[in-house]
């Protein structure tokens, strides 16, 4: 088999739409009968996934793999940085934790990871027809270029043609694209095969004079003006938009606590699709109100975020509502917070030895350590309101939690998972709503508590909904992007 062709998507800045454009290209190539795979040498994200091999990777490449119809593979994201503070991150290489590093230390040493990057890429290139590569931030960060392993530095390593994307929705797209091109070296500019304007609203004819001038000044073709597509596909860069209070006019109200180090917000995305369940994020006690359900999400720093809950008044508000019977569900770090104590005597979670009082809503005790559990799991929910719901989920957490009382679920071998006490539920299972079984059971229970008839709520299975959204994305991008030019840039004929 010949080595895979490739196309790389770089952006003028973070949030330009690289991730979704890569997902669209993965879908388009798959629709065209090609074996496409995504690749991002280094991703910085709080949202991660566990592969079937028990290895950790960024969710952006998981989404792109799903769009391509292939199994997520850690080779698609050999380096993952998970911020744990304003100046440091957990460094994960080939799915395994290498340790904590300050930003300055990582910057000095990251070139040593090039062999890991190239081994992952070369291995994928032997199996795939096309590799869709995503850059990070901007290739024109002139203070970082000398150590670049994710933008033009990577493009040179793998000899990738590049599409440069700018976001017109924020304004200034012509300056973004022109300025980025001007700050690149001549050999880097030569790699750019086309400019793409993303998130356009309105009549493209109005843009024509600007496009012509941009092409004249950069000597590069504009190969697409992609409209602002209303698709519901998880995207790390759109988290800030998702965190804005969503809710809507639905009869049921679910409030997610907006923790400072919130991670894996994707756990709750399936709930947003339920026709009766409004989902919103809250950052203070005033916003909390009186919801039908309170959700405590995962976090990259359980200890600091628990202290934040205390300081901002959300702990007091949550405890009052829980005492009145409001259901509370904690996932991963949120589950740990719900317990009696959190023992970080080694300082592995917060960076300083301490033991904290938990929220006291579950009979559990958590002891943190350096060891991280990573696994894909199957389980059956045993908690009374949702008993029988079958889950396919994954675990990523440090710390061991000892629980008394009833479990939330059981593994196939009979082992217990999570904890339940009255109206409070805790679990380590990420992706617990993806199959739809628990979503249906949870919404049905909440409806019965409120006297609402849930029978008219037709819920599309998450897998089918995701497929529809990928196809919608691909259709929109295919119609707007010159795919002949994209195939030509890769040295391929259009399929």
Q: Where in this protein do the model-derived segments appear?
A:
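Catalytic nucleophile serine of serine hydrolases
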Residues: 332
């Amino acid at each position: 088999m010949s080595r895979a062709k490739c196309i790389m998507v770089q952006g003028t800045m973070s949030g330009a739409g690289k991730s979704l454009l890569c997902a669209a290209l993965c879908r388009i190539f798959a629709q065209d009968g090609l074996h496409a795979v995504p690749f991002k040498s280094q991703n910085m994200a709080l949202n991660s996934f566990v592969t079937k091999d028990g290895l950790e990777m960024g969710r952006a490449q998981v989404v792109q793999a799903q769009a391509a119809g292939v199994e997520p593979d850690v080779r698609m994201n050999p380096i993952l940085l998970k911020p744990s503070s304003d100046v440091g991150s957990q460094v994960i290489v080939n799915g395994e934790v290498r340790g904590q590093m300050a930003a300055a230390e990582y910057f000095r040493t990251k070139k040593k990871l090039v062999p890991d990057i190239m081994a992952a890429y070369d291995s994928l290139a032997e199996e795939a027809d096309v590799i869709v590569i995503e850059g990070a931030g901007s290739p024109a960060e002139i203070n970082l270029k000398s150590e670049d392993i994710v933008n033009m530095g990577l493009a040179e390593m793998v000899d990738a043609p590049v599409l440069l994307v700018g976001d017109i929705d924020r304004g200034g797209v012509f300056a973004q694209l022109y300025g980025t091109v001007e700050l690149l070296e001549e050999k880097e500019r030569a790699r750019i095969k086309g400019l793409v304007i993303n998130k356009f609203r309105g009549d493209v004819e109005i843009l024509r004079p600007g496009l012509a001038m941009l092409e004249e000044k950069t000597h590069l073709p504009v190969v697409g003006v992609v409209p602002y597509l209303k698709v519901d596909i998880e995207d790390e860069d759109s988290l800030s938009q998702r965190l804005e209070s969503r809710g809507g006019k639905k009869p049921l109200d679910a409030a997610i606590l907006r923790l400072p180090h919130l991670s894996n917000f994707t756990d709750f995305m399936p709930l947003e699709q339920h026709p009766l369940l409004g989902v919103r994020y809250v950052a203070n006690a005033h916003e909390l109100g009186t919801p039908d359900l309170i959700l405590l999400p995962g976090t990259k720093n359980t200890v600091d975020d628990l202290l934040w809950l205390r300081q901002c008044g959300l702990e007091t508000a949550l405890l009052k509502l829980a005492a009145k019977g409001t259901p509370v569900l904690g996932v991963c770090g949120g589950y740990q917070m719900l317990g009696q104590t959190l023992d970080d005597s080694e300082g592995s979670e917060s960076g300083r030895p301490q033991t904290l009082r938990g929220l006291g809503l579950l009979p559990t005790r958590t002891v943190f350590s350096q060891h991280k559990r990573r696994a894909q799991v199957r389980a059956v929910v045993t908690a009374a309101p949702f008993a029988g719901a079958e889950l396919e989920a994954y675990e990523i957490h440090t710390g061991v939690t000892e629980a008394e009382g009833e479990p939330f679920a059981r593994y196939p071998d009979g082992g217990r998972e999570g904890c339940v006490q009255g109206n409070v539920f805790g679990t380590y299972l990420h992706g617990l709503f993806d199959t739809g079984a628990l979503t249906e059971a949870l919404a049905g229970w909440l409806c019965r508590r409120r006297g609402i008839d849930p029978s008219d709520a037709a819920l599309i299975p998450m897998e089918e909904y995701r497929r529809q959204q990928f196809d919608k994305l691909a259709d929109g991008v295919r119609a707007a992007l010159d795919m002949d030019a994209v195939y030509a840039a890769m040295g391929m004929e259009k399929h």
